[in-house]
């Protein structure tokens, strides 16, 4: 039995989330169908993180246990040949036998994009939240920094069963410029050991109150300390959010070299968001 790791990118617009659901189009469902078409095996493919309907990914990771004898390049090309246009394998790797895409992960990173221009750019309508106004980026940065470290994030998640911990460790945060289609956007980026359901979108929705002057930095900190969801802002729309990276301890995965991608003729440098071992 082999354990194969997959690096995924997808446009979440037309997926009902990443996790498999009966008779509903999901990322996991599309992957498992493509795997069966390629290998004639029915296997459960496990994703590192669950993304909601409309949320995108450029650095999602999955694993599958298999007896296929296909080499990694054949798996890569074959899966992409069977996958829909809004889901693609970016890299494949041979993982250690006990590797688990979810439980072996030590860090996950998300980016939320906001366009503050007077008029929206139609090409970005599925990946960027349009907000026609001025935001106080300095205040948003200061508020977001309050989340760094280990905290109880109960105020920034939906109702959670009492037995589940809402404590998470936020490793770093950033609010800054991001250019796309020659458009200057505002990016909110966060990295943590794990995230709660809707956590990033609730943080962004509350940060927007700070940016608009409807909540102070101190009040944002009070929301965190309160553990009360009712004090936080609205949940930001899903389409502005992208899972950009999942990171693992070194030595768990041997990824295919970028120079061996697909046709093997052009060396492609691997973007930093695709480096999944530290």
From Swiss-Prot:
Residues at the catalytic site: 52
Q: Which reaction does it catalyse?
A: uridine(38/39/40) in tRNA = pseudouridine(38/39/40) in tRNA
Instruction: Quote any Pfam family the record assigns.
Output: PseudoU_synth_1
- Binding positions (substrate): 110
InterPro entries tied to this protein: PsdUridine_synth_cat_dom_sf (IPR020103), PsdUridine_synth_TruA (IPR001406), PsdUridine_synth_TruA_a/b_dom (IPR020097), PsdUridine_synth_TruA_C (IPR020095), TruA/RsuA/RluB/E/F_N (IPR020094)
Region Disordered, as annotated, extends over 259-278
Its keywords, alphabetically, are: Isomerase, tRNA processing
Q: Per the record's keyword annotation, is RNA-binding included, yes or no?
A: no
Q: What ranges does the record list as Polar residues composition bias?
A: 261-278
EC number annotated for this UniProt entry: 5.4.99.12
Q: Which residues form a coiled coil?
A: none
Q: Output the Gene Ontology terms for molecular function.
A: pseudouridine synthase activity; RNA binding; tRNA pseudouridine(38-40) synthase activity
Gene Ontology biological process terms in this record: tRNA pseudouridine synthesis
User: Which NCBIfam families does this UniProt record tie to the protein?
Assistant: hisT_truA
Family statement drawn from the similarity comment of this UniProt entry: Belongs to the tRNA pseudouridine synthase TruA family.
What is known about what this protein does?
A: Formation of pseudouridine at positions 38, 39 and 40 in the anticodon stem and loop of transfer RNAs.
Record text on subunit structure and interactions? Homodimer.
Name the UniProt record assigns to this protein? tRNA pseudouridine synthase A
The upper taxonomy is: Bacteria, Bacillati, Chloroflexota, Chloroflexia, Chloroflexales
What gene name is listed for this protein?
A: truA
């Amino acid at each position: 039995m082999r354990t194969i790791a997959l690096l995924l990118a997808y446009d979440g617009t037309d997926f009902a989330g990443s996790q498999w659901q009966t008779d509903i189009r999901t990322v996991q469902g599309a992957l498992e169908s493509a795997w069966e078409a390629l290998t004639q095996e029915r296997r459960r493919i496990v994703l590192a993180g669950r993304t909601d309907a409309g949320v995108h990914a450029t650095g999602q990771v999955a694993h599958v246990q298999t007896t296929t004898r296909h080499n990694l390049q054949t798996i890569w090309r074959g899966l992409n040949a069977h996958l829909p246009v809004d889901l693609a394998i970016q890299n494949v790797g041979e993982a250690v036998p006990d590797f688990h895409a979810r439980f072996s992960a030590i860090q996950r990173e998300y980016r939320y994009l906001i366009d503050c221009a007077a008029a929206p750019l139609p090409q970005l309508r599925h990946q960027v939240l349009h907000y026609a106004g001025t935001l106080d980026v300095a205040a948003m940065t200061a508020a977001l920094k309050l989340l760094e470290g280990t905290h109880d994030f109960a105020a920034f998640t939906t109702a959670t069963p009492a037995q589940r911990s809402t404590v998470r460790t936020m490793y770093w945060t950033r609010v800054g410029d991001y250019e796309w289609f020659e458009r200057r956007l505002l990016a909110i980026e966060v990295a943590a050991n794990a995230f709660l359901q809707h956590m990033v979108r609730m943080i962004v929705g509350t940060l927007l109150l700070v940016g608009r002057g409807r909540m102070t930095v101190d009040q944002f900190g009070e929301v965190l300390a309160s553990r009360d969801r009712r004090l936080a802002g609205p949940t930001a729309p899903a389409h502005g959010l992208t899972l950009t990276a999942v990171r693992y301890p070194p030595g768990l995965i041997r990824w295919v070299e970028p120079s061996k991608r697909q046709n093997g003729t052009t060396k492609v440098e691997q973007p930093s968001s695709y480096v999944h071992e530290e």
